Amino acid sequence: MTDHFDYDVFVSYRHADPDGGWVRGRLVPRLRADGLVVCVDVDDFRLGAPLILEMERAVQASRYTLAVLSPRYLQSGFTELENVLAEHLGLERAERRLLAVMYERARPRLSMRARLYLDMTDPAGFESAAVKLCAELRRNPDE
């Protein structure tokens, strides 16, 4: 992690299961096991703070925002806001600040489809995808 980021990654996901269970029970523990510092709302958002300000803080304090794509994710205004914040910050700084993994097949909006994302829809391929994701999360956003 570089000095100016508190987190390697802020995970943007839907809380509803199965998304929330997979993120909190499988993805986040795997990232942390690899030594990454992960920001997850349920662990890191301050109690009583305005939610939108906490989203903004998480995006700014993290090297990357990781969108966990699913049909439910794409229907949420909150996750859309997290994406817009990360995309805008990336444009301001000429950096790649938004990454995505496809947890469950879905058709994202055009700006997300224009990005390469990591397919994690096959449980049998989880570990190899996680290795690739961890390596990418260690890179500088301006590379």
Language-model features: locations:
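Glycine-rich, charge-decorated loop segments at or immediately adjacent to ligand/cofactor-binding or catalytic sites
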Residues: 105-117
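Conserved N-terminal substructure of TIR/SEFIR domains
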Residues: 1-68, 87-96, 103, 110, ...
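Conserved TIR/SEFIR loop-to-helix hotspot centered on a Trp-containing motif
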Residues: 71-91
